[in-house]
Amino acid sequence: MRLRKLKSLKHNGKRLTEILEAHERFWKGTGTRADLTGADLSKADLSKVNLAGAILRNANLEGSDLRGARLPGADFTGARLRKADLRNTDMTEASLAGADLREAQASGVEFFRCDLTNANFQKALLRNVNFRDAHVDGAKFTGANMGIAILRETDISKADLTGVDLSTTLMPAGYGAKKQGA
């Protein structure tokens, strides 16, 4: 699969490279926050880009490469990230409510304090991820690979974990006792 380069992408008539440069300056107090709401970033090479705090609501990132990207506090509400490569990204406090992450490669991702309400992680690769203190109500993890995932301090009672092997997952305190007593 061939990925699209940043310089070839546009959103609302602006080159993506210009939007990202302004976003970098935003953190220094002189630019503007990247608003990529509804952007078509499918199959894009976004590896190692800084999208911390960016707005990507309902954006299409299917099949994109986001490996090593900086994504803390980004808003991916309703975004399509199916088959995206998110390995080793920091998504601390990002919002992925209602996002589609089916079959995403997300090993090593930091989902600390993320809003994952109603996110779809079906058949995603989620090895060595940190879901600590994340909100996962209504999230679907059916068939996901969650080996060595951290779910401590996370209320998983309203998440769908059907078909997930949790034998190596660090679970919330008392999870096994609650499950056995149910």
Description of each model-found segment:
Residues K5-A182:
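Tandem repeat scaffolds
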